[in-house]
Amino acid sequence: MPVLLDPENALALDVLLAGTDAQGLDWHLSAPDAADLPRIRGIGTLSSAGSEEISFLSNPRYQNQLATTRAAAVIVTPDVAQARQEQGASGHVLVVCKHPYLLYARLAQWFERASRPAGPAGVHPSAVVDPSAEIDADARVGAQCVIEAGARIGRGARLGPGCVIGAGSTVGADSLLHPRVTLYAGVHVGERAIIHSGAVLGADGFGFAPDPTLGRGAWGKIPQLGGVRVGNDVEIGANTTIDRGALDDTIVGDGVKLDNQIMVAHNVRIGAHTAIAACVGIAGSTTIGERCTIGGASMLSGHLAIADDVNISGGTAVTSNIAKAGRYTGVYPYAEHSEWQRNAAVIQQLALLRRRLRALERE
């Protein structure tokens, strides 16, 4: 029961669905004969939902839970609804939809908005705002935020406590920065972005040049003069870092979703609607196409080009360009330690074994 409306605010199921952003999802209701449509106060899983909550079935492995769920209504696919009808199963109001997971997402968004504390617009008295900064009258700036010179905060934007917006940076309309987000100078965040706590955008990229005048093996710093540009409808997870470009900006396209603890180095470009799971490291100047997915803990070398519609499995090390859409995996499977040691010993001898095999073939 993650979200519940007060009893007086419960909504009839059809009213709730009509009030969500469910247009185009082609849903309809299937109710037992003479059943009244339930009033809904929340949303939950099949195993945890109560009698005033709606649930959903999108993964067939949980289909057996339909028989025991207490949910007032369940979102299912047309195939599941037809199968239940043929089996004579009854008792639940069904919301029949080709995309139950997407309809669940829309409902979750509605409940999140409905339960969000409204809070007044304005700037908290403890915030420090440079006189040249521009803050829209409908924006909300939390306690102990710092807004530096020339920064702009758009209409309906919300900044949680302790956020820092550097000089000349912008936060677009209706964007949400959770507590302690840091935007260095020259970082531009689009509209409807969500940035979670601890994220840092615009820190210096890792740029150094060998400089023998400073000593043997010494490095001279290369100032990072670019910025960071984040598109519309982007979400950035907690403690993710996006470095500023050396000269050109680091770019995160529209609709990109970044999980927690991702490292995006300087001058990386991430195409629209790409989703990247936690703990991925992307080295400098790599370009990732649109609609890609990158599994957790993957590593991408620098100066690479990744095509559109590429799916990279978790833990993969990408060290060369990927020019063709598709799924790519480069993970050595786990095994019991003793077996892994034996396999590793064989791998180290592959070149020798190959030479021996070729010699045998020539005989």
From Swiss-Prot:
Purpose: Catalyzes the N-acylation of UDP-3-O-acylglucosamine using 3-hydroxyacyl-ACP as the acyl donor. Is involved in the biosynthesis of lipid A, a phosphorylated glycolipid that anchors the lipopolysaccharide to the outer membrane of the cell.
Family note: Belongs to the transferase hexapeptide repeat family. LpxD subfamily.
Annotated NCBIfam families: lipid_A_lpxD (TIGR01853), PRK00892.1 (NF002060)
Any one GO cellular component localisation term in the record: membrane
Name of this protein: UDP-3-O-acylglucosamine N-acyltransferase
Keywords, ordered alphabetically: Acyltransferase, Lipid A biosynthesis, Lipid biosynthesis, Lipid metabolism, Repeat, Transferase
Lineage: Bacteria, Pseudomonadati, Pseudomonadota, Betaproteobacteria, Burkholderiales
Family matches, as Pfam families: Hexapep, Hexapep_2, LpxD
Classification via HAMAP family: LpxD (MF_00523)
Superkingdom, taxonomy of origin: Bacteria
EC number(s) recorded for this UniProt protein: 2.3.1.191
Coiled-coil parts of chain: none
Pathway field: Bacterial outer membrane biogenesis; LPS lipid A biosynthesis
Subunit structure, as described in the record: Homotrimer.
InterPro entries the UniProt entry points to: Hexapep, Hexapep_transf_CS, LpxD, Trimer_LpxA-like_sf, UDP_GlcNAc_AcTrfase_non-rep
Transmembrane regions: none
Catalytic activity: a UDP-3-O-[(3R)-3-hydroxyacyl]-alpha-D-glucosamine + a (3R)-hydroxyacyl-[ACP] = a UDP-2-N,3-O-bis[(3R)-3-hydroxyacyl]-alpha-D-glucosamine + holo-[ACP] + H(+)
First-tier enzyme category under EC: transferase
GO MF annotations, alphabetized: N-acyltransferase activity
GO BP, one annotated term: lipid A biosynthetic process
Active site: H266
